[in-house]
């Protein structure tokens, strides 16, 4: 199945728009795992098993693995998700952006080494920096558009022909870049007005929406701004609020409870 097909099936099967971000910070791991070999994989595996029936996707953030020399554990994790929970897509959050020849190797990293179903990329260097990822049939390419961090406004609100840059990116994705239906866009929950504008521009294109949970994005405003006519169209990401709900032995159950509550809150407004 393609990334888009997997995502659509997961929306329906798990009745969920929730994406759980896998950002394993060694300083916040459960006390019982601190300093143990393979702790990053073990922690993420427990989170995955506790939440897989509640989510539409998992999103490992590559920097949390690379900074700990845990690339092998990231490979192991993606393989585990595919084997133990088939049908739940894995988005590699890498935010890559480089010239085409270098992007070819980043695409190999994402799709051949890590075997992710989708990857996040930056559009700043133009279409030729993204085309190597699109050369992989069925893989998702999720483009930064209006990010959740406050500093995103420094660039994303610069005016281009009377429009903010993030709108120009959304229009380019819709009109020129998404020829094979592989693209999605990143739009932060911290900016619901911009979510609504991007949805208006791109139609039913999937939106990856970080910023609820620890970043404080409003779930009701996010869902109402970003949902498609059938109540889907979004991967609403929560990382820290779920991952670090507890540092005790009950951490996986605590994570499940927060994920369940988050899914239920999303669905309250999704179907309302």
UniProtKB/Swiss-Prot annotation:
One of its GO terms (biological process) is 'de novo' pyrimidine nucleobase biosynthetic process. The active site is at 95 (proton donor). It catalyses: orotidine 5'-phosphate + H(+) = UMP + CO2. Signal peptide: none annotated. InterPro entries: Aldolase_TIM, OMPdecase_AS, OMPdecase_type-2, OMPdeCOase_dom, RibuloseP-bd_barrel. Pathway: Pyrimidine metabolism; UMP biosynthesis via de novo pathway; UMP from orotate: step 2/2. Keywords: Decarboxylase, Lyase, Pyrimidine biosynthesis. GO terms for molecular function: orotidine-5'-phosphate decarboxylase activity. Transmembrane segments: none annotated. The keyword Lyase applies. It comes from the Bacteria. Its EC number is 4.1.1.23. Belongs to the OMP decarboxylase family. Type 2 subfamily. NCBIfam families: pyrF_sub2 (TIGR02127). HAMAP family: OMPdecase_type2. This is Orotidine 5'-phosphate decarboxylase. It comes from Cupriavidus metallidurans (strain ATCC 43123 / DSM 2839 / NBRC 102507 / CH34) (Ralstonia metallidurans).
